[in-house]
Amino acid sequence: MQYSGVDSETYAREALPRFKPKRGKAETWVKLAKEAGCVYTILTSRHHEGFNMFDSKFSDFNVKTTKGVDIVKEYAEACKKYGMKAGYYFSLLDWSHPDYDPTGSGISYPKGNYEAQKQGRRQFGNHEKYKDYLYNIFNELLTSYAPVDLVWWDFSQPGFQGDKAWNATALMKNLFEKNPKAIQNNRLYHSANHLSEGGIRVTPAWKGDYSTAEHHIPATGINGDWEACQTLNGTWGYSADNQEWKTSQALIRELIDTVSRGGNFLLNIGPMPDGSIPPESIRIFKEIGFWMKKNGEAIYGTRANPLNIELTWGRLTRKGEDITYIFVYDKPDNGELTIPCSFEGDVKAVLLGGEKTVNMSQDKTSNTPPFYIINMKMETAATGINVMGKRMIHKRSA
């Protein structure tokens, strides 16, 4: 809608007849996510155009128009069936609501709506009333589709955030009263949004549980808990015109990069108008799932790279005090992986997915740090190695 240049009414008139979700599709989404190794999922409950993907008594612009298919209800039931945490993307914006007023906020608003306002076909209403509406539909989501385990708010700007724009305190209070174990990102406030390739400002914890990086992975991670979200091609929603699919190998590297820098990885799928997942998306998710079955222990429950440097040939993650995982992207020509650290106690290295031990030795040359050197025959890219040894110690040369 933002790119089409039309107003909300024209967009709804053109788009809704094409939106024909079939029953049972939400379960296929959750099942595929489970097979790919995901432990939580996030469904777009509503986006900026204001269409609610659940039945609401506060708005007629919702799934009542889709022949009775309550997508959020099916999704919530599927999450329970497959043991997945149920998260929801929830747009704070609503381009269709008559009381939503973004004037002077710096937040994106369709050009078509501004044109309609100039022509007298559309007027901005009372934004205080809109905040009441926002609270009411969010409360519907919390009460009718419980449990809501995660909320992915979107989004704010410097002059339009928090209580002023969204009555954020009341929204957060309602979430935690309904589910004290729920978590949320911090996009109810502006500083939660990514600023550039160079980094992200982190808001205080009371403004959200984690930060979000959109379409990039910060080179040094982000202080505190964070998540990187990425697409399979160049779009978030389904686009028949965009067939520039990323390879599963490239996305696995992005997953590893994210985890090795202390973050979670959220990978987006844009279903087709009937709810079917594009074949290429299915293929990519299944390939990632195959890799995760072999290497998942180096992803789940791990911490960021314990060294203060990033290796040129791969990445590291750490679990507890005894295990370091090594991901090999590009094997050096001499077949040796040099790690500038030492381990306390006995050390052993094995390939993940088996018990095959790889040779590991320590370079004790006096004029260098105590490097550990692993000699191995790399079978595939992003091969995982489990190094079992007590506390890793990074040494700097003088």
Residue locations for each model-derived region?
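Mature catalytic domains of secreted/periplasmic carbohydrate-active enzymes
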Residues: M1-A398
